């Protein structure tokens, strides 16, 4: 009996040793007021900025204001059941979103929850949406081209992997079209894409998703969607969710393209939240930290050095201007943050020029280092020629007495403008772009009437298809060697002769001499 008792005592002692008492300090606050998506809560003295707060009925919010006795919390989703006196509980964690390859082909909201009707996202990894951007020593300079498939951009304003290139312009000038065409052109190029719809109409987002599906681009794309019907807190959060999803692939050494469409609506949503939180307004009623809002977002797009995986995030933020005013507060802020801008203008768009990029005000500050050599060789003076044409074109409208030189510049300019026209959803390969530029640079287009340029471009793509030996050689070498240039000249002379022979009422003496094509 004594043995049995000793055995029980030993067992109890062992169990006592195993026992560890954990005290959980759960801070619970009380809602003082709730209105317009903002809750004022007392009793959460130790709450952290950007901390996730859990309310009754599974309602969540994020801490944006820390005051002496209360905290200001932006609420997500339907908060209609929240009342004065409702409880609020600290989660001791910041906002996180699911990340990983499971996000590809999915449409998610600003919280990373699926909204495409294809079931929940079975993510195994989550990452916090607010992070410090990689430091200078983790980065390297941009040295690889991101092929947009848009001739004007790849030739004149090349974008490199890891660059931030702003697309700025009035509404209905083709800004989104450029971004979507760039996503479509990443097919089979091992580039992951994230499209962030910020404050867009539901119908517009549905149209964009349909366009991506038709072009088989959704398999490497994630769409983060905070539409006009969502709360301002969701709109505010969406770009940070998008860049966090992109950073997962960046860490894996992959290349990512992210589009923010558009940051003007993002700034307006942040202004609304700030005013509701009673923060002091500044210029155009925006809060004082609206610059930091966009700089901390766009600085997370970068090109990492090889020690850190060598991945990249290329960002295409979009800004909408009012009546072409790029000197407004938000446009100038984002221009100063980014590595260049493409300025879209209504006058060119209405005149039928697609893409409607104004050459004079657009620039790419770092992309030229990443430009393909074949394209670089052919674009030497193209920007200058187009700038001269633009100036002379407006000048020539005032008088008809023009000297021969001016007439030549105008005629050449008209043909170049036709050559760089490009319909939506039809990106060009780098080889075809190089060949179009070759035709411009070596003045083969002077033999073609202006209204026949579009057909001539079509003829170039048909003639120099994937099986053509010149196409293969240029695709492999990625530059015009002396021998390749000579072969290409000969091929173009034959092509131009064949093309002009099909034209009716064509007189070569109006354009040049036949000897130039022999």
UniProtKB/Swiss-Prot annotation:
Keyword Zinc-finger in annotation: no
Membrane-spanning parts: none
Catalysis performed (reactions): ATP + H2O + 4 H(+)(in) = ADP + phosphate + 5 H(+)(out)
GO molecular function terms attached to this record: ADP binding; ATP binding; proton-transporting ATP synthase activity, rotational mechanism
GO cellular component: plasma membrane; proton-transporting ATP synthase complex
Membrane topology of the entry: Peripheral membrane protein
Keywords: ATP synthesis, ATP-binding, Cell membrane, CF(1), Hydrogen ion transport, Ion transport, Membrane, Nucleotide-binding, Translocase, Transport
One Pfam family per UniProt: ATP-synt_ab_N
Top-level taxon of the source organism: Bacteria
Enzyme Commission code(s) on record: 7.1.2.2
Site (Required for activity) location in chain: 362
Residue positions binding ATP: 169-176
GO BP terms: proton motive force-driven ATP synthesis
Cell compartments where the protein resides: Cell membrane
Quaternary context: F-type ATPases have 2 components, CF(1) - the catalytic core - and CF(0) - the membrane proton channel. CF(1) has five subunits: alpha(3), beta(3), gamma(1), delta(1), epsilon(1). CF(0) has three main subunits: a(1), b(2) and c(9-12). The alpha and beta chains form an alternating ring which encloses part of the gamma chain. CF(1) is attached to CF(0) by a central stalk formed by the gamma and epsilon chains, while a peripheral stalk is formed by the delta and b chains.
Family indicated by similarity: Belongs to the ATPase alpha/beta chains family.
Functional note: Produces ATP from ADP in the presence of a proton gradient across the membrane. The alpha chain is a regulatory subunit.
HAMAP family: ATP_synth_alpha_bact
Name by which UniProt lists this protein: ATP synthase subunit alpha
Species of origin: Mycoplasma genitalium (strain ATCC 33530 / DSM 19775 / NCTC 10195 / G37)
Gene name per UniProt: atpA
């Amino acid at each position: 009996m004594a043995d049995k008792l000793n055995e029980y005592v030993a067992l109890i002692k062992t169990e006592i040793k195993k026992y560890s008492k954990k005290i959980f300090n759960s801070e619970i606050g009380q809602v003082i007021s709730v209105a317009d998506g903002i809750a004022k809560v007392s009793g959460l003295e130790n709450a952290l900025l950007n901390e996730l707060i859990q309310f009754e009925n599974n309602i969540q919010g994020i801490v944006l204001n820390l005051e002496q006795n209360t905290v200001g919390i932006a609420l997500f989703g339907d908060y209609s059941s929240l009342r004065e006196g409702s409880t609020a509980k600290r989660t001791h964690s910041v906002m996180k979103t699911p990340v990983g390859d499971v996000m590809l082909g999915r449409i998610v909201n600003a919280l990373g929850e699926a909204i495409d009707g294809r079931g929940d996202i079975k993510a195994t990894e989550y990452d916090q949406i607010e992070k410090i951007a990689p430091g200078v020593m983790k980065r390297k300079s941009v040295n690889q081209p991101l092929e947009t498939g848009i001739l004007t951009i790849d030739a004149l304003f090349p974008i490199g992997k890891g660059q931030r290139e702003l697309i700025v312009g009035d509404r209905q000038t083709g800004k989104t079209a450029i971004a979507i065409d760039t996503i479509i052109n990443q097919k089979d190029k091992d580039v992951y894409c994230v499209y962030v719809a910020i404050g867009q109409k539901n119908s517009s987002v549905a149209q964009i998703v349909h366009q991506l599906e038709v072009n088989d681009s959704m398999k490497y794309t994630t769409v983060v969607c905070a539409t006009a019907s969502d709360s301002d807190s969701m709109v505010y959060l969406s770009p940070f969710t998008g860049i966090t999803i992109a950073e997962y692939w960046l860490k894996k050494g992959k290349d990512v393209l992210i589009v923010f469409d558009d940051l003007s609506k993002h700034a307006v949503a942040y202004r609304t939240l700030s005013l509701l939180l009673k923060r002091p307004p500044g210029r155009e009623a925006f809060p004082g930290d609206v610059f930091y809002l966009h700089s901390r977002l766009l600085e997370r797009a970068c090109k990492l050095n090889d020690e850190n995986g060598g991945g990249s995030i290329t960002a295409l933020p979009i800004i909408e201007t009012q009546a072409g005013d790029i000197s407004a507060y938000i446009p100038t802020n984002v221009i100063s943050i980014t590595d260049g801008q493409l300025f879209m203008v209504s006058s060119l768009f209405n005149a039928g020029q697609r893409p409607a990029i104004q050459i004079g005000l657009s620039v790419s500050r770092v992309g030229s280092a990443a430009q393909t050599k074949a394209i670089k060789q052919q674009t030497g003076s193209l920007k200058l020629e187009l700038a001269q044409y633009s100036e002379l074109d407006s000048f020539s409208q005032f008088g008809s007495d023009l000297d021969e030189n001016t007439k030549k510049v105008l005629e050449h300019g008209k043909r170049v403008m036709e050559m760089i026209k490009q319909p939506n959803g039809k990106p060009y390969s780098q080889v075809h772009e190089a060949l179009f530029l070759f035709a411009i640079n070596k003045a083969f287009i002077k033999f073609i009437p202006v209204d026949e340029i579009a057909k001539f471009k079509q003829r170039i793509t048909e003639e120099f298809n994937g099986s053509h030996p010149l196409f293969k050689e240029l695709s492999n070498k990625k530059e015009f060697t002396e021998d390749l240039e000579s072969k290409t000249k000969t091929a173009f002379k034959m092509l131009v002769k064949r093309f002009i022979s099909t034209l009716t009422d064509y007189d070569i003496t109006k354009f040049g001499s036949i000897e130039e094509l022999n």
